[in-house]
Amino acid sequence: MKKKTIISICVLLLLASCRNRSTGYQQSHEDKQAKEMLQGLWTNGENSDPAMLVRGDSIFYPDSAIMPVRFWVYQDTLYLQGKNLHGYKIEKQAPHLLKFTNQNGDEVRLVKSGDKTLRSAFSYHVYAMNTFREQSQDTIIRTDLGYFESKVHVETTSDKVIKSTYNDNGVEVDNMYLDNVASLRLLNHGTPVFAHDFRKQEFQSLIPKDFLFRSILRRMYFTHADAKALYYYVVIGIPDADTTYVIELRVTPDGRMSKKLR
C-alpha cells in the first residue's frame, strides 16, 4: 500500500513539474519556420484594415493603447503571452495567409500585406491609457467652526495596472493604466489641519483583495460638512468600467480621520 502511495505521489509530482515547465519547453521547441512566416504586417481578410505587425518575438497592434505581446508557435498553436497566456489553434498557415480560431470559436482570417503605408498605424504607442491625467478640487467650506480651505489633487503614479479586453478579432489584448494618488490638504483660517496622500492600498480592509489588485484609485472629492466633520468620497474601481467601491472619509476639525464603505 505504501509503495502504491509513493508511486502515485511521484507521478503527481512529475505531472506538476511538466506543467510548470510547459511554457518554457514550448518556447525552446517552437516552430521556427511558422514563426518566420508570421513576420510582417497582416490585415483583416474582409476589409484589408491593419490587424497586427509581427516583428521578432513580438506582435504589435494598430490600436496605440494596446500593449505589444510576446508570441511563439508550438504544435500548430499560436501562443500569446500577455497578462494571461492564451493559445489559438492555427487552421491554416501559408506565406501570405493565416487562419486561426479565436476564443469564441470563430475563424479569424488574416492576409499578409506589403503596403508600407500601413505601417504608420503601428508607429505610435501610448505608455498608459491615463498618463498625465490630473484632477483638482479647491473648495472653501463654511462650518460652525469657521471657514476651511480644502485642496484635493489626484494624479498618476508609476504603479501599473493591466486590464485585459478583446479586440475586434476576438483576441485577448492588454491595456495598461497607471494608478493614482489622491492628496488632501485641509486648512482652517490658513492653519494646516490635515494633510495626507491616499493610495488604494490604504483601503484594503474595506475592499476585496482581488478587486483591489485590478483597480485604480479613480477619484476623490469633497461632498459635504456638518457641525462635527468634513466628508469626502474616494472612488476605487476597475479602469474604464462601471464597477466601483466608494469609501467615505470623515475628517474632524482637529485632524482626525476615519473611513467606511458607502
Describe these PLM feature segments:
Residues 14-17:
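C-terminal motif of bacterial Sec signal peptides marking the signal peptidase cleavage site
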Residues 19-25:
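Bacterial lipoprotein signal-peptidase II cleavage site
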Residues 26-50, 125-141:
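Tryptophan-anchored aromatic micro-motifs
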Residues 44-88, 173-191:
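N-terminal glycine/threonine-rich, aromatic-flanked beta-hairpin/loop signature
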Residues 98-99, 148-153, 228-237:
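Short beta-strand elements that form the blades of beta-propeller/WD-repeat-like
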Residues 106-165:
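Surface-exposed beta-loop interaction hotspot
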Residues 193-212:
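Surface-exposed loop and turn segments in beta-propeller and other repeat-based domains
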Residues 206-239:
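Acidic, glycine-rich flexible loop segments
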